[in-house]
């Protein structure tokens, strides 16, 4: 099993960061995939299912995401239902420290194909997923710390209040 973890500190309220983390449009921007079925707009909640489609490494990809745990505003987990991985799980943990939000994302995955899967995981997917995760966290930080968050959360009163 491969594990990838990354953390970012965000100068924005915890609730805003949590909601942005669950926002489907923002996830689509960072993954370069499109939600096709299930919940395709807004923010995910417990029990939601989404089918994502896109191209990765020159191949069409389908990835079904299930929201398997949802504990706002501190934690949610998405787990692959169907897709190219043997197993894929992504934990999103958020907490507040000194008026800032700390967001830690941890992904765990395994691939089919035994030894070949482990080689592909180590040399191709771990670096690729690490870069994608870092890009997602930096984008989330940029949006949360600016007025851009209003585009993704136009109706969220709780997201409007600063923790400073």
Please report, for each region that a protein language model flagged, where it lies by residue.
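A short, structured loop/turn motif at beta-sheet edges
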Residues: 11-15, 68-73, 93-102
